[in-house]
């Protein structure tokens, strides 16, 4: 995806308020992998309540579209499939119509969102040209990333492996409250 698809996070934009931070090709390659895997896993960590998960995905897709001033055909097709799925999982059509997304579905959707973030923030022809700053796209998935960072922080402070499963995810709190 990075090499053939031209999905390399090279220009990070003006992170500290000055000029753009531009990474070398190899550092950008590693940083892209880190970001895509991180966002993918962050979405996987909120998949415990399907309606909550799909609302976060819809918000991310709408955010991408607003920031980039365009609706891509792939993004529109994705939203057209996701909106009925979300309605079904809200229980508006009855409990028997709910669909479990599972790990693979959540990871595929997270990967799709992460790839779209990279594609809208990078110009494959001119590294210095950025239509959307990468840091702006992070606001589209703020709750998802904050949940992941919070869970990692709790695991580190408890001296646990960040890869162990637990009930620290935000959807467990909602489930415990009866949602």
What are these regions (language model features)?
Residues 1-148:
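"…together with the soluble PPM/PP2C metallo-phosphatase catalytic core" -> "…together
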Residues 48-49, 177-179:
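Short helix-to-coil transition segments within interhelical loops
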Residues 95-96, 149-178:
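Cytosolic, membrane-interface loops and tails of multi-pass inner-membrane proteins
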């Amino acid at each position: 995806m990075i090499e053939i698809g031209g999905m390399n996070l090279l220009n990070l934009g003006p992170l500290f308020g000055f000029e753009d931070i531009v990474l070398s090709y190899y550092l950008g390659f590693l940083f892209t992998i880190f970001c895509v895997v991180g966002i993918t896993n962050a979405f996987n960590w909120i998949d415990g309540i399907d309606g909550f998960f799909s609302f976060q995905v819809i918000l991310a897709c709408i955010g991408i579209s607003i920031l980039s001033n365009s609706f891509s055909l792939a993004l529109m097709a994705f939203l057209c499939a996701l909106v009925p799925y979300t309605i079904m999982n809200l229980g508006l059509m009855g409990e028997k119509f709910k669909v479990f997304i599972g790990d693979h579905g959540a990871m595929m959707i997270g990967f799709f969102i992460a790839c779209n973030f990279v594609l809208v923030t990078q110009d494959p022809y001119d590294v210095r040209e950025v239509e959307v700053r990468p840091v702006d796209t992070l606001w589209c998935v703020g709750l998802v990333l904050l949940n992941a960072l919070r869970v990692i922080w709790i695991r580190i402070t408890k001296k646990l492996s960040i890869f162990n499963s637990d009930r620290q995810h935000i959807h467990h709190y909602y489930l415990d409250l009866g949602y």
